[in-house]
């Protein structure tokens, strides 16, 4: 497993496989999945965190079932662009996953993804209790959608036939 940039992963991803989006929290891992054309991110049920080995296996089971080619994981930078303790925890999680999978990871700036996800859920008139259940996967979808949009832009600028 390696950590790649969005430009690097655009070069190596095989067609017809999905990408998973992850929002790593202390209690849950928010999940989302792309369609096979890599245009749309869809939220999936969260993984309730127990301990790393169990969390990792649940994530790998999800990846296998969904034929995932790689992961986009939110990097929770501070608003000033500095890396805080949550960034360190995210990087440690990815380093630990290195022992478990050969699938690549992309770090994606997730600043304000949870805020944006919550606003959408509020606009949809989702109750506070339901928002709490859905917020992490909705944030994972925002993270993944940002990466998918960038991949689409890279494909268009490269003249890729899959960008239409």
Swiss-Prot record:
Enzyme class label: hydrolase
Alphabetical list of Pfam families matching this protein: RuvX
The keyword Nuclease is assigned to this record: yes
Key word Cytoplasm present: yes
Gene Ontology cellular component annotations, sorted alphabetically: cytosol
Compartments (UniProt record): Cytoplasm
EC code: 3.1.-.-
GO function term, MF aspect, one: nuclease activity
InterPro entries according to UniProt: RNaseH-like_sf, YqgF, YqgF/RNaseH-like_dom, YqgF/RNaseH-like_dom_sf
GO biological process: rRNA 5'-end processing
Entry keyword set: Cytoplasm, Hydrolase, Nuclease, Ribosome biogenesis
Record family assignment: Belongs to the YqgF nuclease family.
Function summary: Could be a nuclease involved in processing of the 5'-end of pre-16S rRNA.
HAMAP family from the UniProt entry: Nuclease_YqgF (MF_00651)
NCBIfam families per UniProt: RNAse_H_YqgF (TIGR00250)
Name of the featured protein: Putative pre-16S rRNA nuclease
Organism: Rhizobium etli (strain ATCC 51251 / DSM 11541 / JCM 21823 / NBRC 15573 / CFN 42)
């Amino acid at each position: 497993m390696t950590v790649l940039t969005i430009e690097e992963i655009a070069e190596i991803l095989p067609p017809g496989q999905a990408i998973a989006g992850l929002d790593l929290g202390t209690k849950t891992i928010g999940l989302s999945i792309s369609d096979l054309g890599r245009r749309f991110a869809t939220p999936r049920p969260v993984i309730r965190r127990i301990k790393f080995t169990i969390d990792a296996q649940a994530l790998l089971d999800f990846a296998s079932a969904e034929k995932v080619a790689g992961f986009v994981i939110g990097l929770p930078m501070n608003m000033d662009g500095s890396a805080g303790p949550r960034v360190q925890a995210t990087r440690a999680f990815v380093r630990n996953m290195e022992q478990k999978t050969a699938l690549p990871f992309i770090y994606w700036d997730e600043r304000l993804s949870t805020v944006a996800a919550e606003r959408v859920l509020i606009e949809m008139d989702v109750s506070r209790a339901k928002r709490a259940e859905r917020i992490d996967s909705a944030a994972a979808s925002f993270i993944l959608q940002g990466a998918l949009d960038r991949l689409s832009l890279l494909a268009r600028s490269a003249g890729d036939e899959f960008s239409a």
